[in-house]
Amino acid sequence: MVFILWRCYTRPRLEVYRFGYHYYLSQLIALLVLAPLAIVGIRGSVTAGTRPITISNANQFVNRPVESSVVLNTPFSMIRSIGKKAFVTPDYMTPEQMEATYSPVHLHPVTDGGHKGKNVVILIVESMGKEYIGYFNRSLDGGRYKGYMPFIDSLLTQSLTYKYSYANGRISMDAMPSILSGLPMMVEPFFLTPASLNDVDGISSMLGREGYSTAFFHGAHNISMGFSAYAHSIGYERYYGLDEYCKSPKYGGMDDFDGKWAIWDEPFLQFTLDNIHDMKQPFLATVFTASSHHPYSLPEQYRDSLTDEGGQPIHKCVRYTDLSLRRFFERASREPWYRNTIFVLVADHTNQTSHDIYKTDLGLYSIPIIFFTPDGQLEARTDEVTVAQQTDITPTLLHLLGYDKPYLAFGDDLLDEGRDRGGYWAFSYNAGIYQLVKGDLMLQFDGTKTTAVYRFKTDPLLKNNLVGRLPEQQPMEQFIKALIQQYMSRMNENRLLFNS
């Protein structure tokens, strides 16, 4: 038996393989082919305007966030979330103290109802910092400053707006959760965290349950920035992006693409009106513009008439967007639904700045928030006391529309007549510093202690740090601690709905 086994089994022997140039050439070709494919697979697209896909993109293909696990695979989820514990719940106070100090739950919302059943159009205007608008800056440059948005200047004379209004974030992907769901950016953009798979409500889902038809419009590639996924997750019925634009025979398709991000604002806003015209009333239509953005280019027909001015390349693009908005409103004003509509105009964030007042830690968040009703039912005025922020937009619209059901939002109804005007606040986060604006004070908190307090209304350049010298510091610090703890705990425990 041993002899047979010895004869039948192959005896091991050393063999030396020599690879010729064919082998190395084939491996090089394989690398050159597979490496770009791997990069495209990781990014999700080859276009510059598309961010690498993340776990929140799964929301685009499911009806509820809880179903996202069917779309996601384990290795991808691990790669995208490993080492990303963005939300760590602090232990500043007991849950009871936290609830008593601050709660995002609007249990018994005060409503107006005088605008009940009206349509809503929300225009999120790319990079429309308050510095670009002459209406807010009449004293700049010795009173000579005119800004770059004359149409917005004219609209503001017919609108409700705020002298002290702020963005909650510094990039575009921070804006949608803030404006449409009342969720400010804290530590990391919501889209990029595992919490993006939480159950989230939004003005679209709330109005959808009241019988509104809903649509979201953005002229970039449909998977760009995760906008379509988030819009789907908060209940928008239809999404119109570059794909839908290119299917319309009425427009120029990719000839209207800016070469980097999206369809130029002017044609895309007209395309938006075409589709709003076909929506069943009442409707909620949300539009996110794109042209006032790096690389600061213009459609060919405007390159001679709109030239560089004011020292910043974005200024000519802001003028183009202003012109596009003018033509949007000129055409919208001829629609039968126009006078029965509430328009909201708000920036996603600020951009290039020229004046020192807009280069401060607060000025970098200074944006317009504008409510306009063509029928004049909402009083046109500039509120010079109330502090407003992006997360206040959903509660304020719900007030106007008579929505009286409980909901959750990290913002307030700006039109609550029973509210002390000095009690409104705005929150932002940047590079490890939490920032709270309330009354006439701005407080900066590093997660452990207050590092700065400024009277920003009388010290707009934030030169006089009053930390440790004001009695208001302690209650403001307690408030921001409760706000942070509420946000972190709700993110980690998937409690972003009222009934959760």
Question: What are the language-model segments listed below?
Answer:
Residues 49-408, 418-423, 430:
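Soluble catalytic regions of membrane-associated enzymes that act on cell-envelope
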Residues 376-500:
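Membrane-interface soluble catalytic domains
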Residues 2-7, 42-43, 74-91, 445-447, ...:
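Juxtamembrane/interfacial segments around transmembrane helices
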